[in-house]
């Protein structure tokens, strides 16, 4: 199993932008501990599993939105979708109380320093979700005032495609983030300086579903899907 080790860089100039991190491919660090000492290695793996379970099932989002994707994100908090099922219904007004930030909308150039400051105010462990085509790559706004992707100035953990993505896509993104958190390796105690975070290299949904989509031969029209949706919701 391969992991990505993220280390902080200390030689950055003050005018350098995000991401201020370097990445390299390494093996799971817990495997070495198990080889050295079976008991403490297994105990460390069990503790990581318990801590990651708690983190993944109590993800509090920061209440922050930029554009129309934010409307779809907040729709996931309504009764019909009920994001509370996944422990992520507690919107926080302060970044210091949030676990992850969703960049939902168009990241304009003048908003970059604001977003960076809010991200810096979040406590570790923290994650970033890029939601929508504009946040992922600038979308249709290939102009001077729009940053062509959040990953130009923030380390992004998850990308949600769509323009805008449906609330179901946001919920699926939460589930994928929880799956990624369950495979993380972080220090279990207080650490000063570099934390040495290990993240598993997750396979993208596009790659995972590629063969299934290619093999599909019967495609439904948008009108058929709309009729099915209307019947499920009791509409005429």
Curated annotation (Swiss-Prot):
It is found in: Cell inner membrane. Transmembrane segments: none annotated. SUPFAM superfamilies: HydA/Nqo6-like. Keywords: 4Fe-4S, Cell inner membrane, Cell membrane, Iron, Iron-sulfur, Membrane, Metal-binding, NAD, Quinone, Translocase, Transport, Ubiquinone. Its main location: membrane. GO terms for molecular function: 4 iron, 4 sulfur cluster binding; iron ion binding; NADH dehydrogenase (ubiquinone) activity; NADH:ubiquinone reductase (non-electrogenic) activity; quinone binding. This is NADH-quinone oxidoreductase subunit B. The lineage of its organism: Bacteria, Pseudomonadati, Pseudomonadota, Gammaproteobacteria, Enterobacterales. The gene is nuoB.
């Amino acid at each position: 199993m391969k992991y990505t080790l993220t280390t902080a860089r200390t030689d950055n100039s003050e005018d350098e932008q995000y991401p201020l991190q370097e990445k390299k491919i390494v093996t799971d660090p817990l495997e070495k501990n198990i080889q050295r000492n079976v008991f403490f290695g297994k105990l460390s793996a069990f503790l990581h599993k318990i801590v990651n379970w708690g983190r993944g099932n109590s993800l509090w989002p920061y209440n922050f939105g930029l554009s129309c994707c934010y409307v779809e994100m907040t729709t996931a908090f309504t009764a019909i979708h009920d994001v509370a099922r996944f422990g992520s219904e507690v919107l926080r007004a302060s970044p210091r109380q949030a676990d992850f930030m969703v960049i939902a909308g168009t990241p304009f150039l003048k908003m970059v320093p604001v977003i960076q400051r809010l991200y810096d105010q979040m406590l570790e462990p923290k994650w970033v979700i890029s939601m929508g085509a504009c946040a992922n790559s600038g979308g249709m706004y290939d102009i001077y005032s729009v940053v062509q992707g959040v990953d130009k100035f923030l380390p992004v953990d998850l990308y949600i495609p769509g323009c805008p993505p449906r609330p179901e896509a946001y919920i699926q993104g939460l589930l994928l983030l929880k799956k990624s958190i369950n495979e993380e390796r972080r220090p279990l105690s207080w650490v000063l300086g570099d934390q040495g975070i290990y993240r598993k290299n997750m396979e993208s949904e596009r790659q995972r579903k590629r063969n299934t989509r290619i093999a599909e031969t019967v495609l439904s029209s948008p009108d058929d899907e709309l009729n099915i949706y209307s019947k499920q919701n009791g509409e005429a």
